[in-house]
Amino acid sequence: MNESEKIDPRELSPLALAFVGDSVLELLVRQRLVEHHRLSAGKLNAETVKYVSAKAQFREEQLLEPLFTEDELAVFKRGRNASKASVAKHASPEEYRASTGFECLLGWLYLNGQLERVHQLFEVLWQQFDPDQK
């Protein structure tokens, strides 16, 4: 993407940011699983779901929220509050809204070029939830 085509995250809806953030988290989890675990594709997918489901993202957001900057917290809340009445099959409305807010934050960080911050937050959650760390 050239400079003139850059996306300004402030112009995107919270749900568009969450759409991007969902992909960011999924890619980070998949990459880490492939790097550190020799599993079949089916098992890799099952492990990925443990990190990217709405319930998992709710737990992850709860862990990371104390680390959010003021701006990050505002973006998270914007995403959480934009989440409508629809909910994931296996998540409460609270979990679904928080996971949408978390995805919104990841999308915002990614599109703002704050990849180091994305990786910093991911490392914190990975250390907490990686099954090999237990």
Outline where the language-model segments fall.
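Double-stranded RNA-binding/processing signature
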Residues: 1-134
